[in-house]
């Protein structure tokens, strides 16, 4: 085992790379944190205590994991790269509250793993430097499963983070904003420079905090259908919702008048663009659509 100096330093990271002859895989989005201050900011934002269970995705060499282990009751980490398992066994050997599962997070039975490893934790947080190429699928997969997650403090590509946290009417606001804000209250923690990673990524990064709502922001009877309807309004951002929905519905061009009636009954001006509609507006559209069986997709 190497000395137990913090992993998140350039010298310790290079020593680990040399010891294990490790080469970064670009296809896995491997950019490891080498700045303890950034990690401390993430830990602080996570409100982790001795009763918290943490899910981490992509622990890498354990930079963030070791700090999580020092603060949380238990850490459950999913690492897809088999080559990193012996490294993590080494770097995390001082901690008996960490479980590393060598699986793809998108294929793993997360609910079962949580029940097996975090069952005695009072709170569960997802805290991770997410692989940038699959950030959105990971978050949606976690949010849409029946897993008792209280919140997320996650690093991601700045552009994606801004979309999650976007306000109605902004350029970043879109269907992803709606899905994430339906489930969670979102806020920005900090912007992160490229220099705190090894190797530096090609994009800027951001840490966002997403706290699970006790109830979704609006009430709908079919979340999947609701999200599809909202997404259709952004199909071509420069077009009006009237145009986008004409293209979205089966025989929409033949039902122009019906679409206008539907929008009018929902109190939505057909000349508006999708980015100007709030989640509550989309919920009205979704409910009113039930009165118009001609509008199929």
From Swiss-Prot:
Its EC number is 2.1.1.182. Gene3D superfamilies: Ribosomal RNA adenine dimethylase-like, domain 2, Vaccinia Virus protein VP39. One of its GO terms (cellular component) is cytosol. It catalyses: adenosine(1518)/adenosine(1519) in 16S rRNA + 4 S-adenosyl-L-methionine = N(6)-dimethyladenosine(1518)/N(6)-dimethyladenosine(1519) in 16S rRNA + 4 S-adenosyl-L-homocysteine + 4 H(+). Keywords: Cytoplasm, Methyltransferase, RNA-binding, rRNA processing, S-adenosyl-L-methionine, Transferase. Belongs to the class I-like SAM-binding methyltransferase superfamily. rRNA adenine N(6)-methyltransferase family. RsmA subfamily. This is Ribosomal RNA small subunit methyltransferase A. It comes from Staphylococcus aureus (strain bovine RF122 / ET3-1). The gene is rsmA.
